[in-house]
Each structure stands twice: as structure tokens, then as C-alpha cells.
Swiss-Prot record:
Single GO cellular component term: extracellular region
Propeptide residues per the UniProt entry: 10-46
Keyword Heme: no
UniProt GO BP: defense response to bacterium
Top-level taxon of origin: Bacteria
Function: Bottromycin D is a ribosomally synthesized and post-translationally modified peptide (RiPP) that displays antibiotic activity against methicillin-resistant S.aureus (MRSA).
Entry protein name: Bottromycin D
Keywords: Antibiotic, Antimicrobial, Secreted
NCBIfam families referenced in this protein's UniProt entry, alphabetically: bottro_RiPP
Post-translational modification (record): The precursor peptide is first ribosomally synthesized and then highly tailored by specific enzymes to yield the final natural product. These modifications include several methylations, cyclization and the formation of t-Leu and Thia-beta-Ala residues.
Location of this chain's protein in the cell: Secreted
Repeat found in the keyword field: no
Annotated gene: bstA
Length: 46
């Protein structure tokens, strides 16, 4: 469920509607910066 949540968060823009994801969003943002290469590309697609 760990990795699934990560991808889910990125796909749903960190699911801002979910307060639980608010904590993840901090970690996710750092993760995105790490692999922001392909993440940035996906963001443009969406």
C-alpha cells in the first residue's frame, strides 16, 4: 500500500481533498523533486 499511495498522491495532485495525504504531500514533494524528471512530464500531460 506504500508505493500505491505514492503514485496515487502524484496522480491525484496529492489528493488535496484528503487530510491524511497532507502529511504525505510533504514527503511526496521531496520525492517529486528527486524524480521530478518524469513527474514534471506527467504534470504537463495532466
Amino acid at each position: 500500500m506504500g508505493p500505491a499511495v505514492v503514485f496515487d498522491c502524484m496522480t491525484a495532485d496529492f489528493l488535496n481533498d484528503d487530510p491524511n495525504n497532507a502529511e504525505l504531500s510533504s514527503l511526496e514533494m521531496e520525492e517529486l523533486e528527486s524524480w521530478g524528471a518524469w513527474s514534471d512530464d506527467t504534470d504537463q500531460s495532466v
